[in-house]
Amino acid sequence: MSKILSFGQPLGSIMQTAYVVDDLEAAARKWTKTLGIGPWLLLEHFEADNMTYYGEPTDIDLSVALAYTGSMCYELVFVHNDVPNVYADVVKDKGYGCFHHWAVSTETFDEDVARYKSQGYEVAFYGEVRPVGGKRFAYIDTRKDNGGMIELIEISPEVEGLFSMVKGMSENWDGKDIIRRPE
């Protein structure tokens, strides 16, 4: 049996679905109104180091909003600047509001990246997230086979803590304070 992470998903399973939006706060409010998902934690100007886009350095500036319903995390992504990036690649084909990727938790990051590469997939976006101790993420471009990308998220106590905190915000939520920012 797989290890169950503190936010309710088995290690190695899909833990998040993500969508690209053109207005983060407006989209979060619409998702709350139509789907009852919330509250949303808004992480503005996402802090990551060593980011690459298909192997080339990128200075993408993005913000994300995270929220839960049950044990599934939803991520809304907004890009602030006009540099080549994985989000613009998908918006070009599908428009804003579109599905972008599934995120999968991993404790075997390097092996998982190598496995996808051996299957002919490319790492489209990579970075090391500052607020969670430099833990890594990699977007694998699997669009040709499943219509979306797969984000590998390297699990650590800090990463687990972030997702558990966001999930905890949704438990017994009274529907108020839809948008929240880190203190």
Predicted regions and their residues:
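Short proline/glycine-enriched turn/loop segments at secondary-structure junctions
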Residues: 128-129, 138
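Glyoxalase I/VOC metalloenzyme domain signal
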Residues: 1-15, 19-41, 54-121, 134-135, ...
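Short Pro/Gly-enriched beta-strand edge/turn motifs at strand-loop
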Residues: 45-51, 120-124
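Conserved catalytic-core motifs of GNAT/GCN5-like acyltransferases
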Residues: 41-45, 127-128
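A short acidic, often aromatic-flanked loop/helix-cap motif at beta-alpha or helix-coil junctions
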Residues: 48-50, 130-133
